[in-house]
Amino acid sequence: MVDVTEQRRIGDPDPGAARLKRKRLLIAAGVVLVLAVPGIFYFSGAYDSWQDNRSLADTCRGSVDTSEVKELLGVDRVRGHDIEADHGSSPRAGQLHKCSVGAPDGNASVSVSLDWSGDAAGPLHDFGGFTPYGDVGMATPLKHGWEGVLDEVSGTRNLVATVNLPCENRRTDARSSSLLVTVQGMGTRSMGGAAQRARFARMTVKTAQNASKAWDCASRAGGEIERVPDSTAHTQVPQGEARGTCVGIKTAVRESVTDAKAPIENCYVLADRGVSQYRISAFYGPFVRALPAQRGYSGVLDPEKPAGNKDGVLWGSAKCPSEGRALYISTRLPGAADRFDPDGDAEKSALKTFAMRSSKRHGCEDLQLP
């Protein structure tokens, strides 16, 4: 038997050495590939996208609708995280759950707060509170079958919205008969235009739908939102020309459009020089018992009395088809002390006109007034 090595001529390469070299090259290439792939994954932006998507899936149990958030905020990336609820002295939204979605640098975001109906004081506070001390707040209905309202945050072009979702499977539970979803936005671009307002409203109601499923609230959804009413918070309507929430009131006013499902309505009665004399509001559903917890109403508004007049606050109520009585209230605003209405007759008349029309619109009866 002839040794293989004897058949190889002097100077021929060693086959074993060649195989070893190829093996080393393959190992080196594999090591380079193992090291390079994570780098490519990271620097290509795929890693950031993966992290963003993973965070959004865990935020508010994945209920936040992010399909239009980038356009809404004016950012290229969004990431989400849950937030601990504020348990301070003032009622704040988010006692059930709270989260935020926005740019990783924190310069633009939307916060989502979830509350059961028994904690409605927090959502009302975050929506604006409607304290008797300020000439602010104009709830605009989302319409399209949604029990929700939209407003601009005072002094900004940012938006806030709240939606009430009655839970058909929780009707007998006084604390959680409905789910309240409150969304606040802070963008790098204005949210004041029609397209942005509609985008914000769509994100709010879609998030509310998702949250109702995640928190076991069997609710009926409204329709698709293509547009929402324009903001009229600073639009003065001449005397006798009111067509919305102030219709029937003969003075100059500021008002919003009406909707039979709006849980909050506002009408501002103006003096001759355009200064607000008093704000008349309607509250339905869980917001009725939430108002006395707002700053300025403690010891003044008695929710157990169907009607009253105390310390410059007039209120009445009506029995509604669902969720008890509605509240109709008029508060005198700063700068209104010099108005000519010594007996309050004009204010009582305006409250009566407002309450009669609002209660009829919502199908309520047994209206009682001071």
Residues covered by each model-derived region:
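N-terminal Lys/Arg-rich, disordered targeting/topogenic segments
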Residues: 1-20
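Hydrophobic membrane-insertion alpha-helices, especially the h-region
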Residues: 14-45
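General secondary-structure edge motif
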Residues: 40, 48-49, 191, 338
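Short, solvent-exposed recognition patches
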Residues: 76-153, 250-333
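A compositionally biased, intrinsically disordered/low-complexity signal enriched
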Residues: 99-101, 110-112, 161, 167, ...
